[in-house]
C-alpha cells in the first residue's frame, strides 16, 4: 500500500466496512492507533480490538486441542449387536437417531453428551452398562477433539440416562431418557426390506408404549455433493419410506417430536442465519419429506412437533480433527428434549409432560 492509498483510507475510515478495516490491520498496512488518530469511531475501534482478542483466543484453543489430539490414545469403540442389548427401560422417553451411513449420527450424540456433561445435567443409569461406557468414551474423545468411529454395520447402542432439570419451575425433577443409535446400514436395510428384527425393530425397541422423539439426520455435505456425483437413492427418499414404515409399524402413535437435523451446517454459506438457512434448505430440497411429515402430523392431530435444526459439532480440520467445539447446536437440541420429553415428579413416581 502506498502513502496516497493509506491517506485516502485514513481520511474515510468511518465510512469503511469493519471487515475491510480488520484486513488492513491484519496485513500490517495500517494500525488501529493510526485509525484512532484520524478520527475512527471509538465503538468501531473496540470492535476491531475485540476481533483480534477473539482470534488470539481461538488460535490458543486450537493449539491446545491439536496438542491434546496428538497425545491421545484412541480406544476401540464397543459397538454391540441386538442380541447384546437388554430390553429398553419402560417409563422413559426413547430418542432414535435415524439416517444413512456417514450422516453424522455418532458425532451428534458425542456433541450432545459432551454438552450435557459440561452442564452437569447427566444422572447415570447403568441398566445397560455397555451403553454408559460407550457414552463416556464419546464424551472423553470429543473433549480431545477425536471424532467417533463410524458405527459398525450391525452396530446398535442403547444409552439410558436421566437429565436433571434445573429450571426453577421444575427444580429437582428428572427426564428419564433412552438414547438409541442404530448404524446407517441397519437404516438402509429397513428402507430396502421393511422394519423387522433384522433391521431396526429387534427386541421390541420400536414396538413399545414409551413416548418417542425421532431425529431424522440429513447430511448437508452429501446432498450438495450429490448435485454433481451420482450417489444412489437420495436421503429424502429413504427417510420418507422409513417414516411411512414407522407409521405402519405403529411407532408414530407414541411419538411426541420429529426433528429434521441438517448436519455439517458449518458448510453453509458464510454469514447466513443458520436456522433460517436450514429451514429453507429442507423446504427447497426435501419437499416430499416435509409433505409426508405434515400429512402424518394431521393424521395424528398435531400430536407431535416438527422442527428443523442446523447442526455443527464445530470446526473440523483435516476431515477428522475437531479443533473448536460448537456449543450452540447441542443447546438447541437439549432445550427441546427438556420441553418435549416428560419428567418425574419430585417423588419420582408419577410422570408428567414438560
Please name every model-derived segment.
Residues 57-86:
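N-terminal pre-Walker A segment at the start of P-loop NTPase domains
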Residues 95-97:
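Hydrophobic anchor at the beta1->P-loop junction of P-loop NTPases
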Residues 100, 111:
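P-loop (Walker A) phosphate-binding loop of NTP-binding proteins
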Residues 103-104:
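Conserved glycine(s) of the Walker
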Residues 108:
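Hydrophobic positions on the alpha1 helix immediately C-terminal to the Walker A/P-loop
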Residues 114-153:
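Flexible phosphate/Mg2+-sensing switch loops adjacent to catalytic phosphate-binding sites
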Amino acid at each position: 500500500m502506498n502513502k496516497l492509498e493509506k491517506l485516502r483510507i485514513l481520511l474515510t475510515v468511518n465510512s469503511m466496512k469493519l471487515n475491510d478495516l480488520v484486513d488492513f490491520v491484519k496485513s500490517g498496512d495500517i494500525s488501529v492507533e493510526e485509525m484512532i488518530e484520524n478520527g475512527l469511531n471509538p465503538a468501531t475501534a473496540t470492535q476491531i480490538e475485540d476481533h483480534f482478542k477473539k482470534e488470539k483466543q481461538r488460535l490458543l484453543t486450537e493449539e491446545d486441542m491439536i496438542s491434546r489430539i496428538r497425545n491421545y490414545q484412541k480406544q476401540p469403540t464397543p459397538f454391540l449387536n441386538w442380541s447384546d442389548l437388554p430390553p429398553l427401560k419402560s417409563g422413559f422417553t426413547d430418542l432414535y437417531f435415524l439416517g444413512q451411513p456417514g450422516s453424522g449420527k455418532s458425532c451428534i450424540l458425542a456433541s450432545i453428551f459432551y454438552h450435557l456433561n459440561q452442564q452437569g445435567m447427566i444422572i447415570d443409569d447403568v441398566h445397560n452398562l455397555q451403553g454408559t461406557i460407550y457414552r463416556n468414551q464419546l464424551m472423553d474423545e470429543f473433549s480431545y477433539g477425536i471424532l467417533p468411529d463410524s458405527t459398525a454395520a450391525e452396530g446398535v447402542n442403547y444409552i439410558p440416562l436421566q437429565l436433571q432439570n434445573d429450571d426453577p419451575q421444575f427444580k429437582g425433577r428428572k427426564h428419564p431418557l433412552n438414547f438409541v443409535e442404530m448404524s446407517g446400514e441397519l437404516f438402509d436395510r429397513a428402507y430396502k426390506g421393511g422394519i423387522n428384527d433384522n433391521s431396526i425393530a429387534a427386541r421390541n425397541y420400536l414396538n413399545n408404549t414409551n413416548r418417542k422423539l425421532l431425529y431424522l439426520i440429513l447430511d448437508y455435505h452429501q446432498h450438495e455433493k450429490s448435485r454433481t456425483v451420482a450417489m444412489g437413492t437420495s436421503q429424502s427418499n429413504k427417510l420418507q419410506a422409513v417414516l411411512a414404515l414407522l407409521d405402519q409399524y405403529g411407532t408414530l402413535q407414541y411419538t411426541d417430536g420429529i426433528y429434521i437435523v441438517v448436519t455439517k451446517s458449518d458448510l453453509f454459506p458464510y454469514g447466513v442465519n443458520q436456522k433460517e438457512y436450514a429451514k429453507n434448505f429442507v423446504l427447497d430440497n426435501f419437499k416430499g419429506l416435509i409433505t409426508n411429515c405434515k400429512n402424518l402430523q394431521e393424521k395424528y392431530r398435531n400430536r407431535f412437533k416438527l422442527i428443523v435444526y442446523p447442526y455443527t459439532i464445530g470446526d473440523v480440520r483435516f476431515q477428522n480433527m475437531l479443533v473448536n467445539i460448537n456449543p450452540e447446536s447441542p443447546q438447541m437440541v437439549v432445550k427441546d428434549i427438556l420441553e418435549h420429553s416428560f419428567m418425574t415428579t419430585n417423588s419420582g413416581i408419577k410422570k408428567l409432560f414438560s
